[in-house]
Amino acid sequence: MNKEKAIVVFSGGQDSTTCLFWAKKKYKEVIAVSFDYNQKHKLELDCAKDICKKYNIEHHILDLNLLNQLAPNSLTRQDITVDKSAPKEGVPNSFVDGRNLLFLSFVAVFAKQKGINTIITGVSQSDFSGYPDCRDVFIKSLNVTLNLAMDYEFEIITPLMWINKAETWKMAYDLGVLDIVKEETLTCYNGIKADGCGECPACKLRKKGYWEFEKEYLK
């Protein structure tokens, strides 16, 4: 297994950007892969491109517009408003069915062609928003499936799986990229860079995490 190269699933948001710079510390060669699925907050792709260009990281954007056709929801349709809070039952309307399944599957195909075994993704079960494809059991299951499907040894690494948003901010701080993550990323479901709209679930979680990080670690 090649332990010197890694591919990062990169959206241009807080979590994947933190993982990207974490990977840069650990591996000699890092490639970022983003997906264009005609998402409503498409500015995230511009953030991803800008970050990779500014910090000299090889970057590829793969076309996955089919996902938009298959899974209409508040992140892929202009006429569907993002839920401001989690529903009592079921998943939030910001959940894109099959997104992480497809992202990781396509990245695995790409990785094999590049002779790379390590795939890094920023999913987290600790602060997850009710998304089933952010759970550790899903990632481990998919890892086994991809290995069997392609007769190749992949290792999917999830640096944020068991840490909360405050600890994710702390990781960025320890990596020396806190300002980059704070100012140059896009997490907002309404497509607003940095601090975002402040109202969508992603912004609320990000803001709460930063407040807890400041309180706990920047005393």
Curated annotation (Swiss-Prot):
It holds the Pfam family QueC. Keywords: ATP-binding, Ligase, Metal-binding, Nucleotide-binding, Queuosine biosynthesis, Zinc. Pathway: Purine metabolism; 7-cyano-7-deazaguanine biosynthesis. It is an enzyme of class 6 (ligase). ATP binds at residues 10-20. One of its GO terms (molecular function) is zinc ion binding. Binds 1 zinc ion per subunit. It catalyses: 7-carboxy-7-deazaguanine + NH4(+) + ATP = 7-cyano-7-deazaguanine + ADP + phosphate + H2O + H(+). Its EC number is 6.3.4.20. Zn(2+) binds at residues 188, 197, 200, 203. GO terms for biological process: queuosine biosynthetic process. CDD domains: QueC-like (cd01995). Its cofactor is Zn(2+). The keyword ATP-binding applies. Homodimer. NCBIfam families: 7-cyano-7-deazaguanine synthase QueC. Belongs to the QueC family. Catalyzes the ATP-dependent conversion of 7-carboxy-7-deazaguanine (CDG) to 7-cyano-7-deazaguanine (preQ(0)). This is 7-cyano-7-deazaguanine synthase. It comes from Clostridium botulinum (strain Hall / ATCC 3502 / NCTC 13319 / Type A).
